[in-house]
């Protein structure tokens, strides 16, 4: 796990060395996160775009392995359709560790949310406490939910609801989502990437689209997905585009299934590995 500014510092260092040596530079950032609006926004994405604007620099990043993870939910509202129920299954591991999820509603919009526990208890998220942390305490399941409601997120202009679960009860949690302004709009919800959350926590009606991780959604990064070089089939778990601004991502595919690489474990020096980071 790396902070975004740590990655930016590392990139800045190798960029300085390349300029000092007057050499072209190729950077591979084999990491990704599913947090954010997936518009290609954010300090790291903007930094990558600024570097990739120069022809002597190339930045390759993985698309991610979220295609079949069931970590993304998408709903599009029509003119007469303003409410939806999002169902999320919470597993045993998260009941002790907790987890987080993000809601992003397209602007212009005025979204509201009620959270329902597996026992049926409902608590509403206040839209009045803007940018402040709300604590929702469920009585029958002894769960606390910390919520930050941001009506206009400063980089995107979209509505962000940041939700953190503390000791969530195992079972089906529901998010009752509504839109006060009739018309066409949509919202997304994303869970953390594989490895940061167990496979037992997922949306019951997921969407595999818009699952390219950040910084893979950056406009000028070379975003790489993976395929099986033996039969030219795409890697089924690879994340899928576009980004939410409809920029085409990933940009291309490279071999990334059962690639022989150096082993970090005991025993063999080399072992097969799979993923879009290897493809990048």
Question: Where are each of the predicted segments found?
Answer:
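Loop-rich non-cytosolic ectodomains and luminal regions
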Residues: 1-280
